[in-house]
Design a protein with these regions (language model features):
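Non-catalytic regulatory/interaction regions at protein termini and inter-domain linkers
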Residues: 1-21, 36, 52
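Membrane-interface helix-start motif
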Residues: 17-20, 50-53, 183-190
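Juxtamembrane extracytoplasmic/periplasmic/luminal helical "stalk" adjacent to the first N-terminal
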Residues: 20-97, 108-114
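Conserved beta-strand cores of small sensory beta-sandwich domains that regulate signal transduction
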Residues: 84, 115-117, 197-199
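Solvent-exposed, extracytoplasmic
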Residues: 95-112, 168-228
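Extracytoplasmic/periplasmic ligand-binding sensor regions of membrane-associated signaling proteins
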Residues: 110, 121, 125-190, 194-197
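Short, acidic, Ser/Thr-enriched surface-loop or helix-capping motifs
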Residues: 119-120, 202
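Extracellular/periplasmic juxtamembrane segments that couple receptor/chemosensory ectodomains to their
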Residues: 167, 171, 227-276
């Protein structure tokens, strides 16, 4: 009897232990489910926060490029207007008065305005500034029937912009702008994040402004294929095709940090809009 009672007691202990273990498993399962639910909720909140942050960043980038586009258009329009009004005044003056007028303008608008060159029938009749004439036209964009905007090469340097005006009386007026001086003064100080920067291209994809001098004047695709052989530019090329259509948009694409050693690959976000 004693043996049987011990057996019963052991069975009760075993059952009691099993019940306790069952409760433990149930509690553990419940806690695991609760933690999993919290993780799912937390992950969902984090994704929404991240997506919201990305959307805000894209909106800010688009506002920045649209603002810069407007500022660049105003700058070009002001220089173009100055050329027309200065010519209207200067072509009635004598030679010395004309030189003084243009020299004063170049000095007051330096270092961005570097030179003014006036020619008639291909012959230079006036120069103000450094007297360095362009040797090669790398890009040309028409503003109107008499005015165009160019990227030109002087010596071995390709960071010069030029407004070229054809007068009604047969003269041509070329205003040479130091593009890097303009970039450093107006564009580089703008905050676009830790690694962001602004770039200006023409309608054919030729780089007109870039934080790196060696990239001025290159084709944004073919030029980089030569500078960085072996890079996959498919995603970048697709985005450039959309830019050439004159669209205003924000794209995510795969590219490279061209300004960093070795140009490491990276997922990028680019906001773009027509500049003129």
């Amino acid at each position: 009897m004693e043996k049987n009672e011990n057996c019963k007691e052991n069975r009760f202990l075993s059952m009691d232990s099993l019940k306790k273990n069952s409760r433990f498993y149930l509690v553990a399962a419940f806690l695991a489910a609760a933690i999993l639910a919290l993780l799912c909720v937390g992950n969902g909140i984090w994704k929404e926060y991240r997506n919201s942050a990305v959307r805000n960043q894209k909106d800010q980038m688009l506002l920045a490029v649209e603002s810069l586009s407007g500022r660049l258009e105003e700058t070009i329009s002001e220089y173009a207007s100055d050329i027309r009004s200065m010519w209207s005044c200067s072509h009635t003056l004598n030679e010395q008065e004309r030189e003084t007028l243009w020299d004063t303008y170049v000095k007051e608008h330096g270092p961005v305005v570097q030179d003014v060159i006036i020619k008639k029938k291909g012959e230079t009749i006036l120069t103000s500034g450094t007297d360095n004439e362009p040797e090669e036209i790398l890009s040309e964009s028409k503003i109107d029937d008499q005015m165009c905007f160019r990227l030109v090469k002087i010596g071995n340097e390709s960071h010069y912009l030029m407004l070229h005006y054809e007068t009604d009386t047969g003269e041509t007026i070329s205003m040479i702008l130091n593009g890097m001086a303009y970039y450093n003064k107006t564009i580089r100080p703008l905050n676009v994040g830790t690694n962001g920067y602004f770039i200006l291209k023409d309608h054919n994809g030729i780089v007109l402004m870039h934080p790196q001098l060696e990239q001025w004047g290159i084709d944004v695709i073919n030029g980089r294929e030569k500078m960085f052989p072996g890079k996959n530019l498919t995603s970048l090329s697709n985005m450039i095709d959309r830019q050439k259509q004159g669209l205003t948009a924000v794209d995510e694409y795969y590219s490279y940090w061209w300004t960093k050693p070795g140009a490491p690959g990276v997922e990028k976000v680019s906001a773009y809009t027509p500049a003129y």
